[in-house]
Amino acid sequence: MEVILRNAVDKLGHPGDIVSVSPGYARNFLIPRGFAYEATQGNRKRIAFEKSRLEALENERIAAAQAIADKLAEVSVTFAARVGEEGKLFGSVTTADIAHQLEAQGFKIEKRQIELNEPIKTLGVYRVGVRLHADVHPEIKVWVIKQ
Protein backbone atom coordinates (compact mmCIF):
# COMPACT_ATOMS: atom_id res chain seq x y z
CA MET A 1 0.00 0.00 0.00
CA GLU A 2 1.34 3.46 -0.84
CA VAL A 3 1.03 6.31 1.65
CA ILE A 4 2.12 9.95 1.73
CA LEU A 5 4.03 10.88 4.88
CA ARG A 6 2.86 13.89 6.89
CA ASN A 7 5.74 13.75 9.36
CA ALA A 8 9.25 12.36 9.31
CA VAL A 9 9.22 8.67 10.20
CA ASP A 10 12.48 6.95 11.13
CA LYS A 11 13.78 4.57 8.47
CA LEU A 12 10.84 5.43 6.21
CA GLY A 13 11.07 8.99 4.91
CA HIS A 14 10.40 12.70 5.25
CA PRO A 15 7.16 14.71 5.02
CA GLY A 16 5.72 14.58 1.51
CA ASP A 17 7.47 11.36 0.52
CA ILE A 18 5.36 8.66 -1.12
CA VAL A 19 6.41 5.32 0.35
CA SER A 20 5.20 1.76 0.01
CA VAL A 21 4.39 -0.02 3.28
CA SER A 22 2.40 -3.06 4.30
CA PRO A 23 -1.36 -2.43 4.50
CA GLY A 24 -1.46 -3.38 8.19
CA TYR A 25 1.33 -0.94 9.11
CA ALA A 26 -0.47 1.83 7.23
CA ARG A 27 -3.97 1.14 8.61
CA ASN A 28 -2.97 0.29 12.18
CA PHE A 29 -0.08 2.68 12.84
CA LEU A 30 0.72 5.39 10.31
CA ILE A 31 -2.76 6.64 9.35
CA PRO A 32 -4.43 6.54 12.82
CA ARG A 33 -1.52 8.40 14.42
CA GLY A 34 -1.53 11.07 11.71
CA PHE A 35 1.91 10.19 10.33
CA ALA A 36 0.57 9.49 6.85
CA TYR A 37 -2.49 9.38 4.61
CA GLU A 38 -3.42 7.17 1.69
CA ALA A 39 -1.78 7.99 -1.64
CA THR A 40 -4.89 8.49 -3.77
CA GLN A 41 -4.75 10.46 -7.03
CA GLY A 42 -6.28 13.54 -5.37
CA ASN A 43 -3.83 13.37 -2.47
CA ARG A 44 -0.91 13.06 -4.90
CA LYS A 45 -1.97 16.30 -6.62
CA ARG A 46 -2.42 18.02 -3.27
CA ILE A 47 1.02 16.95 -2.06
CA ALA A 48 2.63 18.28 -5.25
CA PHE A 49 1.07 21.68 -4.53
CA GLU A 50 2.05 21.53 -0.84
CA LYS A 51 5.64 20.61 -1.69
CA SER A 52 6.03 23.71 -3.84
CA ARG A 53 4.52 25.86 -1.09
CA LEU A 54 6.72 24.29 1.59
CA GLU A 55 9.78 24.72 -0.61
CA ALA A 56 9.04 28.45 -0.94
CA LEU A 57 8.62 28.74 2.84
CA GLU A 58 11.88 26.87 3.41
CA ASN A 59 13.71 29.22 1.03
CA GLU A 60 12.35 32.19 3.00
CA ARG A 61 13.55 30.63 6.27
CA ILE A 62 17.00 30.03 4.83
CA ALA A 63 17.20 33.63 3.59
CA ALA A 64 16.16 34.97 7.01
CA ALA A 65 18.67 32.71 8.77
CA GLN A 66 21.40 33.80 6.36
CA ALA A 67 20.65 37.47 7.06
CA ILE A 68 21.01 36.83 10.80
CA ALA A 69 24.18 34.80 10.15
CA ASP A 70 25.73 37.72 8.26
CA LYS A 71 25.11 39.97 11.27
CA LEU A 72 26.36 37.34 13.74
CA ALA A 73 29.63 36.95 11.83
CA GLU A 74 30.60 40.45 12.98
CA VAL A 75 29.63 39.86 16.62
CA SER A 76 31.88 38.91 19.49
CA VAL A 77 30.85 38.23 23.06
CA THR A 78 33.11 39.08 26.00
CA PHE A 79 32.97 37.62 29.48
CA ALA A 80 35.03 39.01 32.34
CA ALA A 81 35.48 36.26 34.89
CA ARG A 82 37.36 35.70 38.10
CA VAL A 83 40.33 33.48 37.50
CA GLY A 84 42.25 31.09 39.72
CA GLU A 85 45.70 29.71 39.14
CA GLU A 86 46.72 28.60 35.65
CA GLY A 87 43.96 30.67 34.01
CA LYS A 88 41.12 28.45 35.18
CA LEU A 89 37.80 30.17 35.82
CA PHE A 90 35.83 30.09 39.04
CA GLY A 91 32.73 28.70 37.39
CA SER A 92 32.29 28.43 33.63
CA VAL A 93 30.77 30.07 30.56
CA THR A 94 27.79 28.07 29.30
CA THR A 95 25.43 28.23 26.34
CA ALA A 96 22.90 30.04 28.55
CA ASP A 97 25.47 32.76 29.32
CA ILE A 98 26.29 33.20 25.64
CA ALA A 99 22.59 33.32 24.69
CA HIS A 100 21.98 35.97 27.36
CA GLN A 101 24.84 38.13 26.02
CA LEU A 102 23.58 37.76 22.46
CA GLU A 103 20.09 38.75 23.59
CA ALA A 104 21.57 41.88 25.19
CA GLN A 105 23.06 42.71 21.77
CA GLY A 106 19.66 42.36 20.08
CA PHE A 107 19.76 38.78 18.79
CA LYS A 108 17.06 36.28 19.67
CA ILE A 109 19.10 33.09 20.00
CA GLU A 110 18.08 30.26 22.30
CA LYS A 111 20.69 28.41 24.33
CA ARG A 112 19.95 25.14 22.53
CA GLN A 113 20.92 26.76 19.22
CA ILE A 114 24.46 27.41 20.47
CA GLU A 115 26.88 24.59 19.70
CA LEU A 116 29.23 24.26 22.65
CA ASN A 117 30.44 20.75 23.47
CA GLU A 118 31.29 21.58 27.06
CA PRO A 119 31.31 24.74 29.19
CA ILE A 120 34.29 27.06 28.77
CA LYS A 121 36.51 26.90 31.88
CA THR A 122 39.71 28.69 30.84
CA LEU A 123 40.72 32.11 29.54
CA GLY A 124 41.00 32.60 25.81
CA VAL A 125 39.21 33.22 22.54
CA TYR A 126 36.79 30.56 21.34
CA ARG A 127 34.87 30.12 18.10
CA VAL A 128 31.38 28.93 18.92
CA GLY A 129 28.86 27.73 16.35
CA VAL A 130 25.26 28.89 16.26
CA ARG A 131 22.67 26.64 14.60
CA LEU A 132 20.15 28.99 12.98
CA HIS A 133 18.91 26.50 10.40
CA ALA A 134 19.93 23.05 9.22
CA ASP A 135 21.95 24.68 6.42
CA VAL A 136 23.12 27.86 8.20
CA HIS A 137 25.78 27.59 10.94
CA PRO A 138 27.62 30.87 11.59
CA GLU A 139 30.35 31.15 14.21
CA ILE A 140 30.81 33.86 16.80
CA LYS A 141 33.88 34.75 18.83
CA VAL A 142 33.64 34.31 22.57
CA TRP A 143 36.31 36.14 24.56
CA VAL A 144 36.91 35.06 28.14
CA ILE A 145 39.10 37.63 29.89
CA LYS A 146 40.41 38.17 33.40
CA GLN A 147 38.25 40.33 35.64
From Swiss-Prot:
PANTHER family according to UniProt: 50S RIBOSOMAL PROTEIN L9
A GO CC annotation given for this chain: ribonucleoprotein complex
Record-given protein name: Large ribosomal subunit protein bL9
Domain of life (superkingdom): Bacteria
Keywords noted in UniProt: Ribonucleoprotein, Ribosomal protein, RNA-binding, rRNA-binding
Keyword RNA-binding attached: yes
Membrane spanning stretches: none
Gene Ontology molecular function: rRNA binding; structural constituent of ribosome
Listed SUPFAM superfamilies: L9 N-domain-like (SSF55658), Ribosomal protein L9 C-domain (SSF55653)
Gene Ontology BP term (one): translation
Family designation: Belongs to the bacterial ribosomal protein bL9 family.
HAMAP family to which the protein is assigned, alphabetical: Ribosomal_bL9
Record function comment: Binds to the 23S rRNA.
